[in-house]
């Protein structure tokens, strides 16, 4: 899945679109995506000026976007103005190594279960085959409140 298809499913745009490409997709089961981390990311200006590190919360956000793509593409639900994909919970988040400019962040999301419209995933971010972060994420699609 290239960036053009990703934009059909995710409502995120610069500077918060954190998935560049989908490398593998197994409907209802798993998705592997890629984020190229460059020194031009706006967050590196302040985090940290002399030793740039991608904020952990943005690594988790990138994982949540990969999980969203897994659910939305599985369900064939494109981004629209009537519904929104919410990140509703996180368990067991761990950060194992920093993510720095020049890294390729591999984002892996695997469905653990789906119940009453809430999806639970095992999510892992890797750089060069080493775990950078991992967590269990919970998300849901809901109508937008007007």
From Swiss-Prot:
NCBIfam families given in the database record: fabZ, PRK00006.1
Membership in a protein family: Belongs to the thioester dehydratase family. FabZ subfamily.
Stored SUPFAM superfamilies: Thioesterase/thiol ester dehydrase-isomerase
Function: Involved in unsaturated fatty acids biosynthesis. Catalyzes the dehydration of short chain beta-hydroxyacyl-ACPs and long chain saturated and unsaturated beta-hydroxyacyl-ACPs.
InterPro entries linked: FabA_FabZ (IPR013114), FabZ (IPR010084), HotDog_dom_sf (IPR029069)
Gene Ontology process terms (BP): fatty acid biosynthetic process; lipid A biosynthetic process
Species annotation: Nitrosospira multiformis (strain ATCC 25196 / NCIMB 11849 / C 71)
Protein name, UniProt field: 3-hydroxyacyl-[acyl-carrier-protein] dehydratase FabZ
UniProt entry keywords in alphabetical sequence: Cytoplasm, Lipid A biosynthesis, Lipid biosynthesis, Lipid metabolism, Lyase
E.C. number: 4.2.1.59
Reactions that this protein is recorded to catalyse: a (3R)-hydroxyacyl-[ACP] = a (2E)-enoyl-[ACP] + H2O
Residues annotated as the enzyme's active site: 47
HAMAP family per the UniProt record, alphabetical: FabZ
GO cellular component: cytoplasm; membrane
Highest taxon of source: Bacteria
Entry-linked Pfam families: FabA
Keyword Nucleotidyltransferase: no
Enzyme class: lyase
Localization per record: Cytoplasm
Annotated GO MF terms: (3R)-hydroxyacyl-[acyl-carrier-protein] dehydratase activity
Primary localization class, coarse: cytoplasm
């Amino acid at each position: 899945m290239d960036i053009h298809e990703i934009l059909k499913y995710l409502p995120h745009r610069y500077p918060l679109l954190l998935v560049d490409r989908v490398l593998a997709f197994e409907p209802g089961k798993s998705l592997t995506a890629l984020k190229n981390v460059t020194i031009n990311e706006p967050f590196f200006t302040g985090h940290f000026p002399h030793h740039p590190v991608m904020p952990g919360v943005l690594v988790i956000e990138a994982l949540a976007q990969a999980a969203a793509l897994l659910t939305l593409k599985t369900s064939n639900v494109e981004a629209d103005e009537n519904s929104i994909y919410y990140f509703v919970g996180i368990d067991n988040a761990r950060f194992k190594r920093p993510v720095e400019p020049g890294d390729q962040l591999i984002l892996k999301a695997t469905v653990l279960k789906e119940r009453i419209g809430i999806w639970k995933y095992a999510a892992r971010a890797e750089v060069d085959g080493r775990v950078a972060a991992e967590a269990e994420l919970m998300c849901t699609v809901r109508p937008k409140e007007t």
